[in-house]
């Protein structure tokens, strides 16, 4: 049976199998520790019965309550290749959405590479829609061009009029994101 639990510092030394995917954004240890310190409830890991890490989600709460922009943000979601197509990503997303609901969020958002159609389609199946395109959000390496991202959102119950998911009519640049 899969166990969903809080991510711990020790997990940082055990999750390389999950982060080997080229579409997974990886960060330095201080970045992960910052999330653990500030938003521990938004950092969840899935563990197999034998103790192997299967996947994780890392997020945070951000935005302005006054402007009805307080929300949960998915910083990273990744499942190890051998554990994909089991509904694990959907379950991790559901947990982050529940936490965001309890924290009074208006919506949950995330950024995904435009080219990652498998992920885009999964998020759409989970009720997310494209709010805007962010031009050259992902920095490329090896002389490749930078890549655009979709900012995808799902309204939560607090956003009764679904204002947070009305798509923007034009793309934005990373520096225009609040």
From Swiss-Prot:
A molecular function (GO) held by this record is:
protein N-terminal-methionine acetyltransferase activity
Principal place of residence = cytoplasm
Instruction: Return the InterPro entries for the record.
Output: Acyl_CoA_acyltransferase, GNAT_dom, NatB_acetyltransferase_subunit
Q: Region Disordered: which residues?
A: 159-178
- Annotated EC: 2.3.1.254
> Which PANTHER family did the record assign?
N-ALPHA-ACETYLTRANSFERASE 20
Q: Which species is the source of this protein?
A: Xenopus laevis
What is known about what this protein does? Answer: Catalytic subunit of the NatB complex which catalyzes acetylation of the N-terminal methionine residues of peptides beginning with Met-Asp, Met-Glu, Met-Asn and Met-Gln. Proteins with cell cycle functions are overrepresented in the pool of NatB substrates. Required for maintaining the structure and function of actomyosin fibers and for proper cellular migration.
Would you tell me the protein name for this molecule? Answer: N-alpha-acetyltransferase 20
């Amino acid at each position: 049976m899969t166990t969903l639990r809080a991510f711990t510092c020790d997990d940082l030394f055990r999750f390389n199998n999950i982060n080997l995917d080229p579409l997974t954004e990886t960060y330095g240890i201080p970045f992960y520790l910052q999330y653990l310190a500030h938003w521990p409830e938004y950092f969840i890991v899935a563990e197999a019965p034998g103790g192997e890490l299967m996947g994780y989600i890392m997020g945070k709460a951000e935005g302005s309550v006054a402007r009805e922009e307080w929300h949960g943000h998915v910083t990273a979601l990744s499942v190890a290749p051998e554990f994909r197509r089991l509904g694990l990503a959907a379950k991790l997303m559901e947990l982050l959405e529940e936490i965001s609901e309890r924290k009074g969020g208006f919506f949950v958002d995330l950024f995904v590479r435009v080219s990652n159609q498998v992920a885009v389609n999964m998020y759409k199946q989970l009720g997310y829609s494209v709010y805007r395109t962010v031009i050259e959000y992902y920095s490329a390496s090896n002389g490749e061009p930078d890549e655009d991202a979709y900012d995808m959102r799902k309204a939560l119950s607090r956003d009764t009029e679904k204002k947070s998911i009305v798509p923007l009519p034009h793309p934005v640049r990373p520096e225009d994101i609040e």
